């Protein structure tokens, strides 16, 4: 792997490399990358999806290499700017605390002030007390406020600017995918690099880059988001807000009007799409096909607000205050654009420099699963992102390495290459170092009913019985992967007491405990069982006895009614393709492989996998799932 990466870098080419768990993937790309970077005076950008991998790289793998390699190199992690405290914003907040915050928030602000004197890096992960999000959002680094001009310089005490300054002397820079695409936007015209003029990129956990880039290109807007920023400007009920630091009585009425119009607009959207008509959607999403489905109630008042906010600039008493004002102007301008684009579907009218229509966008309305009656979002997404990667990532005379344990379908890179526009990118696939035939046994119940709307109770009952049966084989120690939240919670209720009688604690995602805490508890309590949804199908690393049993409740096909899935399938069909075999099945197989990969993390690990979906043996496409993983013993349970 290291030789292949070094050869690719020397040739200034791009590479997809599938590297299974257990081969020492991070060392295999870091060693050649460091040598190449030092030799050619380049920077290595390592981008990951999970925080766990970032911390492993910066706290474990890189320090180890710094101690043993004969070449010296510096490495630094850069987090998103909102993770850093901005001392200037903090002082501005302290000076205006009476008009910005209530009593409890002022106490939290004072705690932050005292913490700022002792913290070494100023990141929120270093905070050792309960943090109020409202307070933190008022003092963290922001793009238009905490700039090099306002907070930089050789003697700066700004944590974010200091972190960026240290990057200039670093050979290896670790970021996450979201931050990479955010930073890349600002310098994408520089054809000699990505984040720096002379750099190259290694995307680890590369199976996630398409989704992250897609989310970055198409931001959403919710009723709660608009309300939040309006109340930060001025909260009439609490008599708090930024505008109280300026002569702005004439704007306060505009804000109240916008709050009312915001509620009315999103209420009308929800009512017309989800509560009336015979063809109303059954789920939480509704695709929008036509322009101007609702009147833009907020447009005039939003334009009025922006005009009035700009008129306040001469009244600002300091540069910090003007920067805060400008950030509000930027925020509301962006909201105005998203709203206008959604109602007029403007992205579908954009053409490239050859007057060719750009990729289609799909638009939809989404209800929050937590507050479906009140929080409504308007969303959009590109249907195909391959052009974006062709033009911006796989550029000539640059190098990008994309690596993951799951980039192929039945040992073939074609699907992943087509999705990312990397048809001409080099490819390499490594075999797993594990002996799956010795370490893993798969069980598949033959008679379990298929999930369907007309037999939910029967399916749920049988599924619960089989989960309980397989948990019993290993006496706990199981990760149970679901694709449906309601089903997971219902079965959790059914099994919790039964498992407790066997001294097996059941941990369930979505019960108020964070993902990281659930995993920590699961690792430490060897006999516990963890029920998880989408995020637990990947990025879970629990070597040893604690995870000896992986139970998949269903093959992980995407919900076919989701607007993005619908649009992607239509896009393929319109080109004469087969959307099931060219999109739905490959996506499910990749996720299936990710799920299977949770079980064996070390060559001493052993365990079982129970697949509680007999489509894998009854349907013609089932063989593609089993063929996508290493050969192991399979038992069909009668």
Task: Spell out what each predicted region is.
Residues 1-18:
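Conserved pre-motif I regulatory segment
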Residues 43-52, 401-405, 476-487, 610-612:
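Conserved RecA-like ASCE P-loop NTPase motor core of nucleic-acid helicases/translocases
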Residues 41-171, 178-181, 233-249, 304-314, ...:
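A substrate-engagement module of RecA-like helicase motors
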Residues 610-638:
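N-terminal targeting/trafficking signals and adjacent low-complexity tails
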Residues 137-171, 181-192, 311-448, 454-459, ...:
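A contiguous, basic/glycine-rich beta-loop/short-helix subdomain that forms a polymer-engagement track
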Residues 483-510:
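Conserved helicase motor "Helicase C" RecA-like lobe of SF1/SF2 P-loop NTPases
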Residues 445-458, 510-617:
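Conserved RecA-like P-loop NTPase helicase motor core
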Residues 29, 35, 55, 60-63, ...:
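Signature of the SF2 helicase/ATPase Hel1-core->accessory helical subdomain module
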């Amino acid at each position: 792997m290291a030789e292949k990466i070094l050869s690719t870098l020397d040739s200034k080419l791009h590479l997809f490399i599938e590297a299974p768990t257990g081969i020492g993937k991070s060392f295999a790309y870091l060693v050649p990358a460091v040598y190449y970077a030092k030799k050619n005076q380049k920077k290595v950008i390592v981008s990951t999806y999970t925080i766990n991998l970032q911390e492993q790289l910066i706290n474990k793998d890189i320090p180890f290499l710094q101690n043993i390699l004969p070449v010296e190199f510096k490495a630094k992690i850069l987090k998103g700017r909102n993770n850093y405290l901005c001392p200037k914003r903090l002082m501005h907040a302290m000076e205006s605390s009476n008009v910005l915050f209530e009593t409890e928030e002022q106490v939290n602000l004072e705690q932050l002030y005292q913490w700022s004197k002792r913290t070494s890096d100023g990141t929120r992960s270093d905070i050792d007390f309960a943090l109020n999000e409202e307070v933190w959002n008022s003092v963290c680094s922001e793009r238009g406020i905490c700039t090099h001009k306002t907070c930089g310089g050789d003697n700066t005490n700004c944590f974010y600017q200091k972190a960026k300054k240290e990057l200039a002397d670093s050979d290896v820079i670790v970021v996450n995918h979201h931050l990479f695409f955010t930073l890349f936007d600002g310098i994408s015209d520089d054809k000699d690099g990505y984040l720096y003029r002379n750099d190259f990129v290694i995307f680890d956990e590369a199976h996630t880059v398409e989704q992250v880039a897609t989310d970055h290109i198409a931001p959403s807007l919710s009723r709660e988001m608009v309300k939040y920023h309006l109340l930060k400007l001025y909260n009439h009920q609490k008599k708090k807000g930024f505008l109280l630091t300026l002569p702005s009585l004439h704007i306060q009425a505009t804000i109240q009007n916008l709050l009312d119009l915001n509620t009315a607009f999103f209420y009308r959207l929800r009512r017309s799409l989800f509560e009336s008509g015979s063809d109303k959607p059954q789920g939480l999403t509704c695709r929008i096909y036509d322009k101007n489905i609702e009147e833009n109630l907020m447009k005039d008042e939003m334009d009025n607000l922006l005009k009035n906010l700009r008129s306040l600039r001469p009244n600002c008493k300091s540069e910090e205050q003007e920067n805060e004002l400008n950030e509000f102007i930027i925020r509301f301008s962006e909201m105005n654009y998203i709203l206008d684009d959604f109602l007029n579907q403007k992205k579908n009218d954009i053409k490239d420099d050859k007057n060719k229509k750009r990729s289609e966008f799909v638009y939809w309305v989404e209800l929050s699963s937590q507050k479906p009656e009140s929080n409504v979002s308007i969303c959009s997404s590109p249907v195909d992102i391959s052009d974006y990667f062709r033009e911006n990532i796989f550029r000539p005379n640059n190098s990008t390495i994309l690596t993951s344990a799951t980039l192929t379908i039945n040992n073939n890179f074609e699907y992943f290459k087509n999705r990312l526009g990397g048809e001409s990118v080099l490819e390499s696939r490594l075999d797993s170092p594990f002996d799956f035939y010795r370490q893993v046994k798969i069980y598949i119940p033959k008679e379990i009913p298929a999930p369907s709307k007309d037999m939910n109770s029967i399916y749920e009952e049988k599924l619960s019985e089989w989960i309980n049966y397989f948990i019993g084989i290993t006496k706990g120690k199981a990760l149970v992967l679901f694709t449906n939240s309601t089903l997971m919670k219902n079965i959790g209720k059914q099994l919790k007491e039964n498992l407790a009688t066997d001294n097996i604690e059941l941990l369930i995602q979505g019960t108020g405990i964070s993902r990281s805490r659930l995993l920590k508890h699961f690792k430490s309590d060897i006999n516990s069982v963890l029920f998880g949804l989408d995020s637990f199908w990947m990025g879970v690393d629990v070597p040893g006895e604690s995870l000896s049993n992986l139970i998949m409740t269903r093959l992980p096909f995407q919900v076919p009614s989701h607007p993005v899935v619908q649009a992607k399938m239509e896009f393929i069909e319109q080109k004469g393709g087969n959307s099931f075999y060219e999109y739905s099945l490959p996506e499910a197989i990749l996720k299936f492989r990710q799920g299977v990969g949770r079980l064996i993390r070390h060559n001493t690990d052993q365990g079982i996998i129970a697949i509680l979906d007999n489509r894998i043996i009854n349907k013609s496409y089932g063989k593609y799932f089993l063929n996508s993983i290493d050969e192991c013993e399979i038992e069909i349970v009668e």
